[in-house]
């Protein structure tokens, strides 16, 4: 079933369901009691009606609207269902010739020949008429006026039946130029038979005249319709004796404007629908008309009749019909399509131009009851009584045009209709009050040009209840009364167009789904002058129509979720809100959803509460203009632009205020939100944001208080007004704050321009630790904001501030325009809180800010900050007065770049001026600043965390005062290419910040001196470089450049020192370059220092810093001698190491004065330095494989970072003030490593030497191997924490010497916090002890040998663990000791409490030592040396005594507790207690063990930064293609130390310029040390690449072509591959075959060969089968002729690749004899397709096919039959073939012809079963097939065009089949065919082809078509039919030589009765 059919059937089913309530009315009408009731009950006198039975009285009520209509409706629905079925199902469409509208005599209605027919009253009469000139009802004669049928031949438009007037009429048509329906003849135009032979398309019968006529026609010049003779006057019968000849009957069809169509040929009236007086609509119906008893009658489909007493046609061509029902009651079908039916209580008043007055009340109730019907045009009706209409009744119907109606009094309508006023041009005045409920409708006004005025009040309540419904066009409505609409009611519902509404009354609307005014029509004009109150989900005005214009001058208050003042769903409308608008509690104000609407607000709007929105601009291309003020608070939104491509103009002010909610919490709000895309928003008014919080106030916290939000994409926003923010946050309640955002821009591609500036007034109370952030502009995303105009910021805040003029991140952009002016007035609150905010903040890569305007700050304020890869520039003027702010903390960077990739540029033309009247003062440390510990210090430009700051060429920085610094970096880079002017004297400023005087301030530390540039930090936080290539001028006082710890300052430009007249200075006051706190300054070779002041000096340094001078120094314009006193500091004679060798390089340098470094360096080669090395800045890396030898001392000073060794480091001594990292595989050898301060030595590799710890803070963490080599020296001495981790080792290779330390770990300074933990292995040999401690005065500190720890002692001269006072020892691991008199653990000699605990294993001697005799004698496991010492061998402890004469315990103790295991394994003399042992011996006596506490854990190493790259590191090249060109040139990569790696290829661009199969690509790679040439490959599998190096070390590549036949792996393409190899050249075809993979080549060869182009051949075969099915399904028309057609758009007419066709099938069967017949078949199909859809395949684009068939059937007795058939099909097809691979995308067009010949012969026998209900026919036979396909040549694809020769195939198939035909009971039937058989023989010719691009070469083509399979056909059809339902199901599947086709179709037909 096609979708259209399905949709229509569903619609019909729904309609049927809705009409289910007709059934009772139909049943009531069919009651037998009807036969006893008179037909004219309504016309009977009251006394006679009283005598009627209740059934008669009841019948009209039940039957009132429905009964006699229902039959016609049901018939119509059934007809529609049938029509749908025939249209969309599978059956053919057949022409249908309607019966003649006559019985053979004169046409109806008949005339008797007289002049009049009854009934007549003397005036206008009813049919038949004589011949008067007045309008009459049928029949008419020939008058000139408009008449009703039948008409004569007048000049006016008439209604049926029509004759032949000059006006357009409805079919039958005469001979118009358009296509018409059959019959056709053989004319030149497409027609449907039968036609004569005229040139025009005509409808039968035609004569052949010059004009198109409708039969019968003579040959006259005028178009006429029957009956006509040929006379001068057109007339229609009946005619009497006039001059005209009588003509045949009129069968014209006329359609009227109110949905009535008369068909004179069928004598029917068709009604499109019936509107009822209660507003509902019935389906239409078809009724017959006739004359009965001299009166017109209408007859419904089920036989009910209506009498017609009047038929009029209005000026609007509406047919008005009225009369009486069978029961005599009045009925009318009026000009608006209403079916008006009187019941027995209805008062009926009819007649035109009458006046009716009534003050009688009305009380009517009951379904379908009607109180009064007033019918007639231009009536004047005055009704003043009260009325009550309930329970489905209709109070009054006024039907007629031009009526004037005045209605007053009180009306109550409940579930009913108050009044229906139907007709055009009516005027209605309402003066009373009306109450509507229960789904009722007060008034329906249906008609054009209606005028309505209401001065009464209305109360409408309940779902479905409606005040006024206006259905017509051009209505004019004036309402002065008040309306109340509640609970789903609707005040007014207007469906007509061009309505004008003026509402001056007040309106109250409440409750969900309640609507005051609902407009569906177009071009409405609505003026609301009254006030509106809307709540509870109600809607004030809803406009669904287009081009509506609405003006609200009254005030509107709308409240509650779901409520809305105005909703515009239509398009191109306009609305003006001139009154005030109040939106609260989640309501919406004015919403535009459609397209092209314009909303304008000139009043003031107030919006408050969450989810409340004042104005919503949704939809597309809408416009909103606001000239009034919008006040927003309490989480409301003033205006929401959620649509796209809209224009918003906001002229009034938008006031966004934070106010307290019901819980006393200050809440948020949003002024304007733009969430749609591509909108234009122009804000010409001001946006004012205000918040004022007292000390104890509470704030919501989120979301922020926001002025304008732009959240969509591609929007343009212009703010011409001012953006004003006033935030007074004095709340001191903890955690209470509410952020403020003036403009928030998210999304991408938005463009925002602020021309009026931003004004921010701010104050805060930070004592609670939280304060609101005030942001003027927030940009997130790829959008641009431009700020122009004058902006001001006044803030009283903490240091750093909480006011940000602009935050930009995530790729956004901010531009402060040339005319932008920003004035900042700031004062700081004394507090310990501070922020890192700035006036302009950028964050993230791709984010930028550019200032082109003027920024002035009165008071200290950071102006610009760039973070995390963002870039900020200044080309305008920035002026900061860093004046006293009454705060102890106000340090600031005016511009700052923080984070790698971040940069701040002071661009050409830019000026940054910094003036301070303060002096530096000590304060808390903030490490990002170069002067870490000082406040009142200010930086014009500063880089931190490895950002960059640049003062560009042409840019200027002015500095005045003490503690001011120009271009600086604590960590990062600072570059000056422009000009820096510094005057270090402290200014005195007047009230206007003019400098009145200056004075010198003596700094307490020299680094506090103002400086033009600064690099590094006063502490160990520096890692920076400052370079000057421009000009620095220092006047009176200050430094040109200063380098601090970790900083290097390099002068490559000019530094000039000057002094004002009369200014005298002192040493170190005016200096060119100063190096302090470990910094390095370098006057480079291009650097110049000009000293033009007497007290100026070139350099200054302290003892930890360095000066290097390679440049020029001039004194008063002349070169200065190095010995001149103006030199100041002396340049160092140490050598500055600026680089270390790369891999493979070696370097040796010698300096008697030593070396120093100033930045991070990495050694990858072999470096030997003869002299001391001072590392002053950055990291020092010795990388894996590298060797660094220092014949001297390496000192890692505090200004450096650390040393990280991965290679081999050999130094005489190393002293470090930073942690040191010896990483895995690293090796350090040194005599002494000195650890200074709080540093850690992480040894993960090998360490040989000694370590000295000089404080109680050093830590040593060993996970590698450590060895002390010098005799007598300890591995570690001093005070330190030591962690020997699991698997790590400590050992000594030297020997103990007298007076030596003779121990591996020597703790020489005791402290109760020091920790020693061994979890690895310590091996002490050659007389060494493992651990030795001095005596301490602290409480005992534990030393651990943990469970994984092993301590070995071999012949120690002193105890292996030799503890002093103040240490406990806990052994949880293993201790092995050997040697005479050796002691494993010895406690300190002390009266302190000391615990020596073993819960592990102590071997006194070893098992191996026992065997080889090396254990010695006199050994002790644990020995005490004090009377407070306790020895404890715990329950887990084991002591094995292997040595002779040795002991587990000994010495002086308080007690010895043994709960463990002691094994005496010696040969002799061993015991538990050594002689002389003292102390209580508790051996397994229940004494508790001492618990060893958990050992402390070692610190973690953390991460080490990435070192600088190896300059000689091979560059790994991958994913690189060497491009080649047609001229033989190629791209060249120049590189040294290059390794050619994976995926490096050479492309085949050269092939387009040469047909050579071997090509050399020269110098593809040039440089030194290039490796990996063998890795080069080709981008194409067709070419082989071989890289090689020439004599210069450059790489050439030889490209050799492979044969296609060798590369291709698909055997089906070998033939074309060989042909292409043979014809190889360099055209487009061949270059396209340079594909990347074998699979791609296989695919390309298949495509170019045409082997995959099979669809056209297959579709032709399918098309032949489709014709067979279409012909078989053709229904017979007559005499054996069958006809069937299918057209494009029908699913049955679809082939693959979006191909469709039109197909016609004709079949003529001729009975030759009683047992023989001959069938002739012909068909034609026209095809239309989109061509190929698959690469390599072809597809139909057009063409046509013809089918010829001849069948002969001979029947024999007993059901036997012999059938023979012959088919010939010819297909002339246009097609295209797609070639698409790589960069190729070609379409080759061609046309070809295919012919198909088939002969089939079969024998069959039919068996009849089940009483002829079932027929079974088995059959068998043979089929011969022959297909011929002509050759073809392609075009439009250039080198890819194929030329294909012709081909043919022949096949013989066996046929075995079975047919079933079943005709069952109850409407069921079925058919089925199952046919199959093997292919007996199949042969196919070999096709060859050639390609245009491979001239002279041909190749075989195999399309893969095969025979030999089993072919088959299966069909099934099931049918069911009943009186009102029919179902057809058909399915088929066909297969032949692998080509298949299948289909399924389901048709359902339902007839509604």
Swiss-Prot record:
SMART domains: Autotransporter. Residues 1-27 form the signal peptide. Residues 1649-1952 form the Autotransporter domain. Residues 101-252 are annotated as: 15 X 11 AA tandem repeats. Residues 31-50, 88-258, 1496-1517 are annotated as: Disordered. Residues 141-177, 185-249 have a biased composition (Acidic residues). Transmembrane segments: none annotated. Sequence repeats lie at residues 101-103, 104-113, 114-122, 123-133, 134-144, 145-155, 156-166, 167-177, 178-188, 189-199, 200-210, 211-221, 222-232, 233-243, 244-252. Keywords: Repeat, Signal, Virulence. It comes from the Bacteria. This is Putative surface-exposed virulence protein BigA. It comes from Salmonella typhimurium (strain LT2 / SGSC1412 / ATCC 700720).
């Amino acid at each position: 079933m096609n979708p259209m059919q399905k949709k229509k059937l569903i619609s019909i089913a729904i309609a049927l369901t809705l009409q289910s309530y007709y059934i009772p009315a139909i049943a009531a009408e069919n009651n037998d009691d009807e036969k006893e009731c008179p037909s004219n009950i309504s016309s009977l006198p009251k006394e006679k009606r009283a005598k009627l039975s209740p059934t008669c009285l009841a019948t009209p009520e039940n039957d009132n609207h429905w009964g006699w209509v229902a039959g016609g409706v049901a018939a119509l629905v059934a007809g529609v269902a049938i029509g749908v079925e025939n249209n969309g199902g599978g059956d053919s469409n057949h022409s249908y010739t309607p019966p003649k509208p006559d019985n053979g005599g004169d046409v109806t209605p008949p005339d008797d020949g007289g002049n009049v027919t009854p009934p007549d009253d003397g005036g206008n009469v009813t049919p038949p008429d004589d011949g008067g000139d007045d309008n009459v009802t049928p029949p008419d004669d020939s008058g000139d006026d408009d008449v009703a049928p039948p008409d004569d031949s007048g000049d006016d438009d008439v209604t049926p039946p029509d004759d032949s007037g000059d006006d357009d009429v409805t079919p039958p048509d005469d001979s118009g130029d358009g296509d018409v329906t059959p019959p056709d003849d053989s004319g030149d135009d497409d027609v449907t038979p039968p036609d004569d032979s005229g040139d025009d398309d005509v409808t039968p019968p035609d004569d052949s005249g010059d004009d198109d006529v409708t039969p019968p026609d003579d040959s006259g010049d005028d178009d006429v319709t029957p009956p006509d003779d040929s006379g001068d006057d057109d007339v229609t019968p009946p005619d009497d004796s006039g001059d005209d000849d009588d003509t045949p009957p009129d069968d014209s069809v006329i359609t009227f404007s109110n949905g009535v169509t008369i068909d004179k040929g069928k004598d029917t009236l068709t009604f499109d629908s019936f509107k009822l007086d209660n507003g509902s609509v019935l389906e239409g119906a078809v009724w017959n008309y006739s004359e009965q008893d001299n009166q017109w009658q209408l007859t419904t489909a089920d036989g009910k009749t209506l009498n017609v007493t009047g038929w009029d046609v209005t000026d609007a061509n509406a047919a008005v019909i009225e009369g009486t029902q069978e029961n005599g009651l009045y009925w009318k079908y009026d000009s608006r399509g209403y079916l008006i039916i009187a019941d027995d209580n209805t008062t009926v008043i009819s007649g035109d131009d009458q006046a009716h007055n009534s003050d009688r009340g009305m009380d009517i109730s009951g379904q379908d009851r009607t109180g009064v019907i007033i019918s007639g045009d231009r009536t004047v009706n005055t009704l003043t009584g009260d009325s009550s209409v309930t329970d489905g009744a209709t109070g009054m119907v006024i039907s007629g045009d031009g009526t004037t109606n005045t209605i007053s009094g009180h009306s109550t309508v409940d579930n009913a209709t108050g009044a229906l006023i139907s007709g055009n041009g009516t005027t209605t005045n309402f003066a009373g009050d009306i109450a509507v409920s229960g789904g009722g409708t007060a008034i329906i006004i249906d008609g054009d040009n209606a005028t309505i005025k209401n001065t009464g009040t209305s109360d409408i309540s309940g779902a479905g209840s409606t005040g006024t419904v206006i259905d017509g066009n051009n209505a004019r409505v004036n309402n002065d009364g008040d309306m109340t609409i509640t609970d789903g009611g609707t005040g007014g519902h207007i469906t007509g167009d061009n309505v004008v509404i003026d509402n001056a009354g007040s309106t109250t609307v409440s409750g969900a789904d309640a609507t005051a005014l609902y407009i569906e029509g177009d071009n409405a004009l609505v003026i609301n002058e009254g006030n509106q109150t809307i709540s509870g989900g109600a809607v004030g005005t809803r406009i669904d129509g287009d081009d509506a214009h609405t003006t609200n001058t009254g005030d509107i208050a709308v409240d509650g979720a779901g409520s809305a003042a105005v909703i515009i769903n239509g398009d191109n409308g306009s609305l003006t809100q001139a009154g005030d608008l109040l939106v609260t509690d989640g309501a919406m104000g004015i919403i535009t959803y459609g397209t092209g609407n314009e909303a304008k607000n000139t009043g003031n709007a107030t919006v408050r509460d969450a989810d409340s929105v004042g104005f919503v601009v949704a939809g597309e291309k809408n416009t909103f203009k606001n000239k009034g003020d919008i006040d927003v608070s309490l989480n409301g939104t003033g205006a929401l632009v959620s649509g796209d491509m809209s224009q918003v103009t906001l002229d009034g002010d938008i006031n966004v205020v934070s106010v307290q909610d019901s819980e006393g919490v200050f809440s948020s709000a949003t002024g304007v939100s733009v969430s749609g895309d591509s909108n234009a928003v122009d804000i010409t008014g001001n946006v004012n944001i205000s918040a004022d919080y007292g000390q104890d106030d509470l704030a919501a916290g989120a979301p922020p208080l926001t002025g304008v939000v732009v959240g969509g994409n591609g929007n343009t926003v212009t703010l011409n007004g001012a953006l004003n923010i006033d935030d007074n946050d004095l709340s001191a309640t903890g955690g209470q704050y509410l952020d403020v955002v003036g403009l928030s821009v998210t999304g991408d591609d938005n463009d925002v321009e602020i021309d009026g500036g931003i004004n921010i007034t701010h104050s805060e109370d930070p004592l609670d630790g939280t304060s609101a952030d005030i942001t003027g502009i927030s940009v997130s995303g790829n959008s641009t904001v431009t700020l122009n105009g004058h902006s001001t910021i006044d803030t009283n805040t903490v240091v750093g501030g909480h006011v940000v003029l602009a935050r930009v991140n995530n790729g956004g952009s901010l531009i402060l325009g040339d005319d932008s002016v920003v004035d900042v007035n700031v004062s700081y609150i004394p507090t310990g809180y501070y922020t890192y905010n700035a006036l302009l903040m950028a964050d993230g890569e791709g984010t930028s800010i550019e200032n082109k305007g003027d920024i002035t700050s009165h008071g200290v304020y950071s102006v610009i900050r760039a973070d995390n890869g963002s870039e900020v520039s200044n080309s305008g003027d920035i002026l900061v007065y860093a004046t006293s702010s009454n705060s102890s903390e106000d340090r600031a960077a005016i511009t700052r770049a923080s984070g790698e990739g971040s940069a701040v540029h002071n661009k050409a033309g830019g000026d940054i001026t910094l003036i301070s009247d303060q002096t530096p003062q000590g304060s808390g440390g903030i490490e990002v600043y170069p002067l870490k510990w000082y406040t009142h210090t200010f930086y014009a430009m500063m880089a931190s965390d490895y950002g960059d700051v640049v003062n560009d060429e042409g840019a200027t920085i002015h500095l005045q005062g003490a503690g001011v610094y120009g271009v600086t970096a604590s960590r990062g880079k600072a570059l000056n290419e422009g000009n820096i002017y510094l005057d270090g004297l402290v200014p005195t400023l007047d009230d206007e910040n003019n400098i009145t005087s200056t004075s010198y301030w003596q700094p307490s530390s020299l680094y506090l001196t103002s400086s033009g540039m600064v690099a590094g930090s006063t502490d160990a936080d520096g890692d920076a470089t400052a370079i000057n290539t421009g000009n620095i001028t220092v006047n009176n006082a200050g430094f040109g450049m200063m380098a601090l710890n970790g900083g290097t300052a390099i002068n490559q430009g000019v530094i000039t020192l000057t002094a004002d007249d009369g200014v005298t200075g002192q040493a170190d006051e005016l200096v060119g370059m100063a190096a302090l706190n470990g910094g390095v300054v370098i006057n480079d070779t291009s650097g110049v220092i000009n000293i033009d002041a007497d007290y100026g000096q070139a350099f200054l340094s302290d003892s930890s810093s360095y000066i290097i001078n390679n440049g020029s120094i001039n004194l008063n314009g002349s070169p200065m001698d190095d010995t001149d006193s103006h030199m100041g500091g002396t340049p160092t004679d140490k050598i500055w190491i600026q680089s270390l060798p790369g891999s493979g390089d070696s370097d040796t340098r010698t300096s008697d004065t030593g070396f120093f470094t100033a930045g991070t360096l990495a050694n990858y080669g072999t470096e030997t330095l003869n002299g001391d090395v001072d590392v002053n800045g950055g990291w020092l890396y010795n990388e894996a494989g590298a060797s660094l030898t220092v014949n001297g001392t390496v000192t890692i000073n505090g200004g450096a970072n650390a040393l990280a060794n991965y290679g081999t480091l050999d130094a005489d001594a190393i002293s470090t003030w930073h942690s040191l990292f010896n990483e895995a595989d690293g090796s350090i050898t040194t005599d002494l490593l000195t650890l200074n301060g709080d540093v850690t030595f992480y040894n993960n590799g090998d360490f040989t030497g000694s370590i000295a710890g000089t404080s109680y803070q050093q830590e040593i963490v060993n996970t590698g191997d450590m060895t002390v080599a010098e005799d007598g020296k300890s591995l570690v001495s001093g005070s330190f924490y030591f962690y020997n981790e699991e698997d790590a080792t400590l050992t000594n290779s030297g020997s103990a010497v007298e007076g030596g330390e003779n121990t591996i770990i020597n703790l020489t300074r005791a402290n109760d916090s020091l920790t020693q933990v061994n979890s690895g292995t310590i091996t002490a040999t050659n007389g060494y002890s493992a651990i030795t401690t001095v005596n301490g005065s602290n409480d005992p500190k534990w030393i651990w040998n943990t469970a994984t720890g092993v301590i070995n002692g071999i012949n120690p001269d002193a105890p292996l663990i030799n503890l002093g006072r103040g240490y406990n020892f806990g052994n949880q691991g293993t201790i092995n000791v050997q040697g005479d008199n050796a002691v494993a653990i010895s406690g300190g000699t002390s009266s302190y409490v000391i615990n020596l605990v073993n819960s592990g294993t102590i071997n006194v001697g070893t098992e191996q030592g026992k065997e080889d005799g090396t254990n010695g004698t006199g050994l002790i496991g644990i020995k005490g040396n004090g009377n407070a010492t306790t020895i404890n061998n715990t329950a887990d402890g084991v002591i094995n005594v292997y040595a002779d004469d040795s002991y587990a315990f000994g010495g002086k103790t308080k007690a010895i507790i043994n709960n463990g295991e002691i094994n005496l394994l010696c040969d002799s003399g061993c015991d538990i207690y050594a002689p002389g042992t003292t102390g209580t011996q508790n051996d397994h006596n229940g004494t508790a063990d001492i618990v060893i506490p958990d050992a402390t854990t070692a610190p973690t190493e953390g991460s080490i930064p990435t070192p600088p790259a190896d300059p000689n590191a091979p560059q790994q090249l991958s994913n690189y293609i060497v491009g080649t060109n047609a001229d033989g040139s190629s791209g060249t990569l120049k590189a040294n130390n290059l390794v050619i790696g994976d995926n490096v290829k050479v492309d085949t661009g050269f092939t387009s310029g040469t047909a050579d199969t071997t090509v050399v690509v020269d110098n593809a790679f040039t440089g030194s040390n290039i490796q990996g040439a063998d890795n080069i490959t080709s981008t194409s599998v067709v070419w082989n690449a071989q890289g090689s190096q020439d004599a210069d070390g450059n790489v050439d590549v030889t490209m050799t072509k492979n044969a296609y036949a060798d590369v291709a792996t698909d055997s089906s393409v070998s033939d074309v591959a060989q042909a292409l190899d043979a014809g190889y050249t360099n055209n487009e075809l061949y270059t396209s075959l340079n594909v990347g993979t074998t699979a791609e080549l296989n695919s390309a060869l298949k495509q170019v060969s045409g082997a995959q182009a099979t669809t056209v051949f297959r579709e032709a075969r399918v098309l032949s089968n489709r014709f067979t099915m279409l012909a078989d399904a053709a229904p017979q028309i007559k005499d054996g002729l069958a006809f069937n057609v299918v057209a494009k758009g029908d699913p049955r007419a679809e082939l693959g690749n979006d191909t469709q066709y039109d197909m016609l099938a004709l079949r003529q069967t001729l009975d030759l004899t009683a047992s023989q017949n001959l069938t002739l078949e012909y068909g034609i199909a026209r095809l239309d397709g989109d061509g190929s859809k698959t690469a390599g395949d072809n597809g139909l684009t057009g063409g046509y096919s013809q089918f010829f068939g001849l069948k002969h059937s001979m029947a024999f007795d007993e059901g036997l039959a012999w059938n023979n058939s012959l088919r010939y099909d010819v297909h002339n097809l246009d097609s295209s073939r797609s070639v698409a691979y790589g960069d190729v995308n070609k379409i080759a067009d061609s046309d070809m012809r295919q012919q198909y010949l088939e002969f089939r012969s079969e024998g069959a026998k039919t068996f009849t079963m089940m009483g002829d209900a079932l027929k079974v026919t088995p059959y068998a036979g043979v089929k011969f097939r022959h297909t011929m396909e002509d050759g073809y040549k392609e075009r439009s694809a250039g080198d890819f065009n194929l030329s294909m020769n012709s081909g043919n195939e022949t096949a013989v198939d066996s046929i075995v089949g079975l047919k079933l035909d079943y005709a069952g009971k109850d409407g069921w039937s079925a058919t089925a065919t199952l046919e199959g058989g093997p292919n007996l023989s199949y042969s196919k010719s070999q096709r060859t082809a050639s390609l245009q691009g491979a001239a002279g070469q041909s190749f075989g083509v195999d399309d893969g078509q095969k025979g030999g399979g089993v072919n088959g056909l299966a069909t099934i059809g099931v049918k069911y039919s009943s009186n009102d339902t029919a179902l057809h199901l058909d399915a088929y599947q066909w297969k032949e030589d692998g080509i298949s086709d299948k289909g399924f179709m389901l048709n359902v037909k339902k007839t509604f009765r």
